[in-house]
């Protein structure tokens, strides 16, 4: 029983350490999602999608992917800001779900 616990504990520690490391070989997930969000076919022809970084008054929604409309001192008003977690593993899962929703949206609109 102790061996199983040690193996499980070692795997958990390894996974946490690996997720905390920044890998410079791959582009940043935020940059990838942002470039996808800025795509013409994703925003739609009528420009109805309100995305991360856009000025807003209430909610920010595009094809079911919702972010929060918050005050920004640097932008001089309210802008859409993405939700996130300080734990990179949770962010990776959230970004994966977001990418799937966006891909579905892009497929429907284009």
Curated annotation (Swiss-Prot):
Amino-acid biosynthesis listed as a keyword: no
Propeptide, chain numbering: 20-43
- Predominantly, its location class is secreted
Disulphide bridges: 49-63, 56-69, 60-105, 62-80
Source species, domain of life: Eukaryota
Q: Which GO terms describe its molecular function?
A: ion channel regulator activity; toxin activity
Question: Where does the signal sequence lie?
Answer: 1-19
Name the keywords, alphabetized. Answer: Disulfide bond, Ion channel impairing toxin, Knottin, Secreted, Signal, Toxin
The domain comment in this protein's record states: The presence of a 'disulfide through disulfide knot' structurally defines this protein as a knottin.
Record function comment:
Probable ion channel inhibitor.
Name of the protein: U32-theraphotoxin-Cg1a
Species name = Chilobrachys guangxiensis
Taxonomy of origin reads:
Eukaryota, Metazoa, Ecdysozoa, Arthropoda, Chelicerata
């Amino acid at each position: 029983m102790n061996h199983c616990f040690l193996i499980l504990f070692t795997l958990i520690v390894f996974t946490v350490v690996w997720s905390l490391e920044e890998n410079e070989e791959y582009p940043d997930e935020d940059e990838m999602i942002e470039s996808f969000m800025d795509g013409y076919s994703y925003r739609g022809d009528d420009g109805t999608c309100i995305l991360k970084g856009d000025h807003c008054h209430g909610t920010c929604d595009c094809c079911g992917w919702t972010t929060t409309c918050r005050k920004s001192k640097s932008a001089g008003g309210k802008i859409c800001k993405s939700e996130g977690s300080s734990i990179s593993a949770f962010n990776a899962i959230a970004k994966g779900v977001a990418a799937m929703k966006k891909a579905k949206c892009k497929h429907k609109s284009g």
